[in-house]
């Protein structure tokens, strides 16, 4: 039988993981991967015009961890560092999405957020690998 949960009405989320760099540990059982994420979403708004569908652009950086079990690679940790989420109509240069910046009402966070800014302020997500040219 199908064990997948039914989709939430009005939701669409397409997020591509692009330009990946995967580093396998010397033990051959663990790895880390860094990917850029770019995509689009459509979902009901949380507070503004409750229930209206809102289309957005979304962008960020993944820093993931993988583990090899029984000869198969599995995701150990999937971590997305949000750079921006903004209305499709306005583009990402104008405004962040108002009313969708809080926790998802369906998928609750496992811990409180430590900080939030609608756009990054020059922060660069730490890289897990050495620079391929300089080695630093």
Question: Could you tell me what each predicted segment is?
Answer:
Residues 28-32, 57, 68-75:
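Coil-to-beta-strand transition motifs
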